[in-house]
């Protein structure tokens, strides 16, 4: 059978999901294999070293470096508070006084009789990694992280902003073609993940943030609306660290793009359930897609279901595969592959390429270069 390979997005009504939760540095894992966790359960902890601050003790006190030990009132390893004296100089029966204070809360790490300086290091900063999704711990990676498994609906988006968030799904649009505008967002949207149709406006994003919504899932967004909302023009190579207070996942891409019917139906059927969403996007090496995970009741034998791990992306394209066209003149339209001719074909650009024949949802059959489609995994 003729087959080709192309990038794709996953849309699953129900599958076993495995998420790896890793510490940025070695630390302590506080759950075991078999443990059941909620989305908020802390599964791993670590501490990063605090920042060092150099204090010019001798210069401040007006003494020679080799005298520093004599006048230090705090020793190596001692805790200090910001503004607390770490060294004091007294002369002429106390008539001449000079003090050196700590610039931060922290610990005296060292002081030198060569440089006349002390190093105060701020307290370690704790790092807590939560489970993100409710489920069961199926693997522990010693000192590094865990793998959590859950049964869920799963949707990968094309672009997103904002980090991990959670909220109850609420339909804010009636059809996949509706535009999500500010007048559709009410006070009862607080804490919710709102589902729009083809597009969301900047006013709607601002209104959602104002009422306390946790996220927005929509087909597309105009670049100017995104810039208006963020206050600056974003680079799309790596996102997810924006401090917006709202996570956005565009399931189809930029512009006004109807959300795929299947995607809209999945979200519609799961209205009222909690969604775990992440807008992080990376289009460079090590591709990261924004995602929506909706934990659902597990069937009797969930272990028999196919497991969807984060690194899996088959890329297989064959007759019957559901794809979306990502270039004009059929940009945004979707359908099933009806043939994959092996012979090279001439296209309008006068280049010679391999093509794919797609039967669009409208019933029309079109031929486009294989590079101009992406898989929507069903």
Task: Set out the residue ranges of the language-model regions.
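Well-ordered secondary-structure scaffolds
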Residues: 1-378
């Amino acid at each position: 059978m003729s087959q080709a390979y192309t990038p794709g997005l996953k849309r699953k009504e129900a599958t076993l999901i495995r998420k790896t939760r890793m510490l940025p540095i070695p630390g302590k894992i506080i759950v075991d294999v078999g443990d059941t966790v909620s989305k908020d359960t802390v599964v791993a902890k670590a501490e990063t070293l605090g920042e060092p601050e150099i204090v010019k003790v001798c210069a401040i006190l007006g003494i020679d470096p080799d005298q520093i030990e004599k006048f230090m009132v705090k020793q190596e390893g001692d805790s200090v508070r910001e503004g607390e004296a770490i060294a004091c100089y007294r002369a002429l029966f106390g008539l001449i006084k000079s003090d050196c204070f700590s610039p931060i809360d922290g610990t005296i790490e060292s002081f030198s009789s060569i440089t006349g300086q002390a190093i105060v290091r701020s307290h370690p900063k704790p790092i807590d990694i939560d489970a993100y999704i409710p489920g069961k711990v199926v693997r522990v990676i010693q000192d590094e992280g865990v793998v959590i498994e859950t049964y869920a609906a799963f949707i990968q988006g094309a672009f997103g902003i904002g980090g991990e968030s959670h909220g109850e799904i609420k339909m804010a649009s009636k059809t996949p073609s509706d535009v999500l505008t500010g007048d559709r967002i009410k006070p009862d949207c607080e804490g919710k993940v709102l589902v729009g149709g083809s597009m969301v406006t900047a006013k709607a994003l601002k209104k959602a943030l104002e009422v306390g919504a946790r996220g927005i899932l929509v087909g597309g967004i105009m670049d100017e609306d995104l810039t208006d909302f963020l206050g600056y023009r974003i680079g799309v190579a790596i996102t997810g660290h924006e401090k917006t207070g709202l996570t956005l996942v565009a399931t189809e891409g930029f512009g006004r793009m109807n959300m795929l019917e299947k995607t809209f139906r999945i979200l519609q059927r799961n209205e009222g359930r909690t969604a775990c969403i992440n807008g992080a996007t990376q289009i460079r090496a090590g591709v990261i897609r924004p995602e929506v995970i909706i934990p659902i009741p597990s069937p009797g034998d969930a272990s028999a279901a196919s497991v969807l791990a984060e690194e899996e992306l088959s890329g297989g394209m064959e007759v019957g595969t559901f794809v979306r066209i990502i270039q004009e003149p059929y940009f945004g339209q979707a359908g099933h592959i009806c043939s994959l001719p092996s012979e090279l074909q001439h296209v309008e650009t006068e280049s010679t390429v391999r093509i794919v024949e797609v039967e669009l949802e409208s019933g029309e059959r079109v031929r486009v270069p294989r590079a101009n489609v992406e898989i929507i995994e069903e």
